[in-house]
Amino acid sequence: MSLISNNEERSLRVRYCIAIALSALLISGCTTLRLPNQSTSVYHQQTWAQRYYDLSRISQWNIDGAFSIQQPGKTIIAAYDWQQKGMNYRIRIHSSLDIYSVNISGRPGMVTLWRSPRQHYTASTPEQLMQQQLGWQLPLSNLYYWIRGIPAPGAYQADFDTYTHLIALQQSGWHIRFSQYTTVGSVDLPRTLQLSNGPLAVKIVVKHWQ
């Protein structure tokens, strides 16, 4: 579904406005989203097989935080709220003052992006849809796994710390570093992820895990 020229111009203006509005989030993100130091003594010592089993069983969560995307000539910064139930999800991407907001809802084979209650678009993958409508994308299909600190299905190379936390991962052309974990209940979950793929660099901060 293509937009008429007036809508394209309005979309470009909105994208320009969000870049300005969200620059404040980029500046404040280093402070308001700075994570407290956590003693490694609270971490759970497990074998990788045990840790992978526990993390792979998590299929429902509510998380929020912020992310930044840096690519040649463009920097995107936004906050997000991510609700996951099984393979179905809803993600709201918004500015700190809600000047700009989009909603992405998906299930296997069908993803919808909502700009407003009457303006929505669909695609078969979230990456395709975000690139078409936002001009940038996050690897959401794989982040379903990476956000829990486990590899997605398929070939990968990984490094672990002494607690068997995944700290570095190469998969599907991406290099992922897990620079901080937090203990939630009986499991340790990522707080900060740094992803790179060629000239594209992404940082994701999880502020709250539920």
Swiss-Prot record:
It is a lipid-anchor. A lipid is attached at C30 (N-palmitoyl cysteine). Monomer. InterPro entries: LolA/LolB/LppX, OM_lipoprot_LolB. GO terms for cellular component: cell outer membrane. This is Outer-membrane lipoprotein LolB. The keyword Cell membrane does not apply. One of its GO terms (biological process) is protein transport. Its main location: membrane. Keywords: Cell outer membrane, Chaperone, Lipoprotein, Membrane, Palmitate, Protein transport, Signal, Transport. A lipid is attached at C30 (S-diacylglycerol cysteine). Belongs to the LolB family. It holds the Pfam family LolB. Gene3D superfamilies: Lipoprotein localisation LolA/LolB/LppX. Plays a critical role in the incorporation of lipoproteins in the outer membrane after they are released by the LolA protein. It is found in: Cell outer membrane. The keyword Signal applies. Residues 1-29 form the signal peptide.
